[in-house]
Amino acid sequence: MKKITKFKDQKILVLGLARSGMAAALVLNELGAIVTVNDGKPFEENKEAQVLLEEGIKVITGSHPIDLLDEDFALMVKNPGIRYDNPMVERAEALKIPVITEVELAYLVSEAPIIGITGTNGKTTTTTLIADILNADGQSAKLSGNIGFPASEVAQKAQATDTLVMELSSFQLMGIDTFRPKIALITNLFSAHLDYHGSQEAYEAAKWRIQENMTADDFLILNFNQEKCRKLADKTKATVLAFSTKEKVSGAYVNEGKIYFKDEFIMEASELSLPGDHNLENALAAIVASKLRGAENEAIVEVLTSFAGVKHRLQYLGEIDGRKVYNDSKATNILATQKALSGFDNSKLWLLAGGLDRGNGFEDLEKDLEDLKGMVVFGQTADKLRLMAEKLNIPVFASQNVATALKEIMPQTQVGDTILLSPACASWDQYKTFEERGDLFIEAFESLK
């Protein structure tokens, strides 16, 4: 932790709670700031607000009163989920009150070097791989950011000898100022969060902010499989290293089935524990970041050959009577399911899919389902998916939910088959979150083992 005095006796407003807002409030309070927290959830339903009140922090809940900003705040720390067109944020900016997100605060309170990972897909897996490799190497890596561990809380506790491995969303990056990671990594850039950002250009601009304070002493890792990312290499002051599955590049790459870092052989690509081309990209990205932090090949190979996946993200659960089972509940859109399917032999694969109907069709998925052994469909999109399967002459069965889907499909499968839950849909028609959906699938798996 840095010895920060700039927050002492400063009036700071934390707008929006949840885990990151609560962490920011507690960190600022410990640093001597005069903290006010404002959250829209009523106090009696607001566990975070109740905890903060017990800590002596001023809490205003149930609404966002504009006149609160008349109190002459020196800074606003905004929950990343709150949009910039929120009246409170607009008023703060009109009053020239700096508005930051909690990751900027994390940078300010820690001397530990930061590896920042952003992108559209693969962030959580890549972030976890990097941390696991560094820890296997005997270093001290701390997971933080958009991965469930509030960045400011982790940063405040970190030592200068630690490495903060930080997953960063576009929402978080919009609220940085001086934030400067030692290593930044962009996994890929696809269409996402247009409801928040308004356009693809604005979304990508938010992601690109990860490198805006970097210099030639810092490293930016880019995915050269994607032309969009390749073109960014000339637009940064940072030193660029690339990863690619298609060509030899400055960082990690695949050549004739072998993985290299620069000219150094690391391992056979076939040894990776996670299936799919996208996970090969994730592994290459993690190798570059880990090598830049001095990790030995032994640690890299140890992790990449044994990593079971992040929970709900193409997570290998095990076998039931010779059938392999994977939980990819995080696949809440067609693109994510396409990436999951790329790692399997369709002729032995049973796909479990369905969920919230957002009004879209599934035509883009058809080519990825060729020769699929069978499907089980559920949720609001069950009929759409069933019709598509019938059109492609794929055996298809309907079920009530993910748990019944697994139980009911088992008699149809054979030894050597693979069962994959990759819904291609959001979970909100039947479940509160994709995590709840995945947990119920795991429970069903455990009951059948």
From Swiss-Prot:
<keyword id="KW-0131">Cell cycle</keyword>
<dbReference type="GO" id="GO:0005737">
    <property type="term" value="C:cytoplasm"/>
</dbReference>
<keyword id="KW-0547">Nucleotide-binding</keyword>
<dbReference type="GO" id="GO:0008360">
    <property type="term" value="P:regulation of cell shape"/>
</dbReference>
<keyword id="KW-0961">Cell wall biogenesis/degradation</keyword>
<keyword id="KW-0963">Cytoplasm</keyword>
<keyword id="KW-0573">Peptidoglycan synthesis</keyword>
<dbReference type="InterPro" id="IPR005762">
    <property type="entry name" value="MurD"/>
</dbReference>
<dbReference type="GO" id="GO:0051301">
    <property type="term" value="P:cell division"/>
</dbReference>
<keyword id="KW-0436">Ligase</keyword>
<dbReference type="GO" id="GO:0008764">
    <property type="term" value="F:UDP-N-acetylmuramoylalanine-D-glutamate ligase activity"/>
</dbReference>
<keyword id="KW-0067">ATP-binding</keyword>
<dbReference type="GO" id="GO:0071555">
    <property type="term" value="P:cell wall organization"/>
</dbReference>
<feature type="binding site">
    <location>
        <begin position="119"/>
        <end position="125"/>
    </location>
    <ligand>
        <name>ATP</name>
    </ligand>
</feature>
<dbReference type="GO" id="GO:0009252">
    <property type="term" value="P:peptidoglycan biosynthetic process"/>
</dbReference>
<dbReference type="Pfam" id="PF21799">
    <property type="entry name" value="MurD-like_N"/>
</dbReference>
<dbReference type="Pfam" id="PF08245">
    <property type="entry name" value="Mur_ligase_M"/>
</dbReference>
<dbReference type="InterPro" id="IPR036565">
    <property type="entry name" value="Mur-like_cat_sf"/>
</dbReference>
<dbReference type="InterPro" id="IPR036615">
    <property type="entry name" value="Mur_ligase_C_dom_sf"/>
</dbReference>
<comment type="function">
    <text>Cell wall formation. Catalyzes the addition of glutamate to the nucleotide precursor UDP-N-acetylmuramoyl-L-alanine (UMA).</text>
</comment>
<comment type="pathway">
    <text>Cell wall biogenesis; peptidoglycan biosynthesis.</text>
</comment>
<keyword id="KW-0132">Cell division</keyword>
<dbReference type="Pfam" id="PF02875">
    <property type="entry name" value="Mur_ligase_C"/>
</dbReference>
<dbReference type="InterPro" id="IPR013221">
    <property type="entry name" value="Mur_ligase_cen"/>
</dbReference>
<comment type="similarity">
    <text>Belongs to the MurCDEF family.</text>
</comment>
<keyword id="KW-0133">Cell shape</keyword>
<dbReference type="InterPro" id="IPR004101">
    <property type="entry name" value="Mur_ligase_C"/>
</dbReference>
<protein>
    <recommendedName>
        <fullName>UDP-N-acetylmuramoylalanine--D-glutamate ligase</fullName>
        <ecNumber>6.3.2.9</ecNumber>
    </recommendedName>
</protein>
<dbReference type="GO" id="GO:0005524">
    <property type="term" value="F:ATP binding"/>
</dbReference>
